[in-house]
C-alpha cells in the first residue's frame, strides 16, 4: 500500500507543481507569457506524464474526485479511498508550499489568488457561484467518463494517459475563465492554504462539486455506457 500512496503523493505533487506553477510563474510573464492555453496544456501534460510514470502502481488518480468515481464504478476498493485522499491532499499541499516559496522570491510578490479557485469576486471572469457549481459538476462527470472509458477493456491498450491528459486540457480551456478550473479537490486545497483567506472560504464548492460530478460520471458509465 505504501508504494500506491507514494505514487499518489508524487503524482498529485507534480500536477499541482506543474499545473499551478505554470499559472503562477509563467502565465503572465512579460511578452512571453503562456496564457490560458499554456496553463491548460501544462495541467494536461502533468497528468499524462505521471500516468505513464506511476499509473501502473496506483492507477494514477492524483485527484480525490477521480478516486471516488473509480470507487463508485468498482475500480478502487472502498477501503483505499480515504488513504488515497490523504496522500493526494498532502502532495498538493507540499507542491503549493514550494511554489509559494519560489514565487515569493520575486520582488513585489503578493499571494493574491495564487492560482486558487473561486467564484464571484474570485472568478477570473466574474462568474456566479451557481455557474461555478454547474461547470465543475459537469466537467468532473465527463472527466470520470473519459477515465473509465479510456481505461476499460474495450479501449486500445496504452493510450489512456493521452486521452485523460487531453481531456484535462480541454476541461481547463473551457473553465479557467469561470472558476480557474478545479475538478480536483486536492489541487484546490493545496493552493487555497497559501492564497488570500477568501480562497479558503470558497473551498467548499471545490470539494462538493467535483465529488458530486464524480459520482454522476461513474453512475452514467456503469448504467449506460460501460460493459467492463
Curated annotation (Swiss-Prot):
It comes from Brucella abortus (strain 2308). InterPro entries: Aquaporin-like, Aquaporin_transptr, Aquaporin_Z, MIP, MIP_CS. This is Aquaporin Z. The record marks 43, 172, 181, 187 as: Selectivity filter. It catalyses: H2O(in) = H2O(out). The gene is aqpZ. GO terms for cellular component: plasma membrane. Channel that permits osmotically driven movement of water in both directions. It is involved in the osmoregulation and in the maintenance of cell turgor during volume expansion in rapidly growing cells. It mediates rapid entry or exit of water in response to abrupt changes in osmolarity. Homotetramer. Belongs to the MIP/aquaporin (TC 1.A.8) family.
Amino acid at each position: 500500500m505504501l508504494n500506491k500512496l507514494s505514487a499518489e503523493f508524487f503524482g498529485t505533487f507534480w500536477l499541482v507543481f506543474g499545473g499551478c506553477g505554470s499559472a503562477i510563474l509563467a502565465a503572465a510573464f512579460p511578452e512571453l507569457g503562456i496564457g490560458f492555453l499554456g496553463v491548460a496544456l501544462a495541467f494536461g501534460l502533468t497528468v499524462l506524464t505521471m500516468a505513464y510514470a506511476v499509473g501502473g502502481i496506483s492507477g494514477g488518480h492524483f485527484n480525490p474526485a477521480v478516486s471516488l468515481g473509480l470507487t463508485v464504478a468498482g475500480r478502487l476498493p472502498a477501503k483505499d479511498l480515504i488513504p488515497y485522499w490523504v496522500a493526494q491532499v498532502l502532495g498538493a499541499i507540499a507542491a503549493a508550499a514550494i511554489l509559494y516559496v519560489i514565487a515569493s522570491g520575486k520582488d513585489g510578490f503578493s499571494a493574491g489568488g495564487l492560482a486558487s479557485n473561486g467564484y464571484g469576486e474570485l472568478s477570473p471572469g466574474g462568474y456566479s457561484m451557481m455557474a461555478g457549481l454547474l461547470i465543475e459538476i459537469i466537467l468532473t462527470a465527463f472527466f470520470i467518463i473519459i477515465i473509465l472509458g479510456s481505461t476499460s477493456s474495450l479501449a486500445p491498450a496504452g493510450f489512456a494517459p493521452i486521452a485523460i491528459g487531453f481531456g484535462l486540457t480541454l476541461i481547463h480551456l473551457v473553465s479557467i475563465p469561470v472558476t480557474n478550473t478545479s475538478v480536483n479537490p486536492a489541487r484546490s486545497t493545496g493552493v487555497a492554504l497559501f492564497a488570500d483567506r477568501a480562497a479558503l472560504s470558497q473551498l467548499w464548492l471545490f470539494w462538493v462539486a467535483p465529488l458530486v460530478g464524480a459520482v454522476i460520471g461513474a453512475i452514467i458509465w456503469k448504467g449506460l455506457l460501460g460493459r467492463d
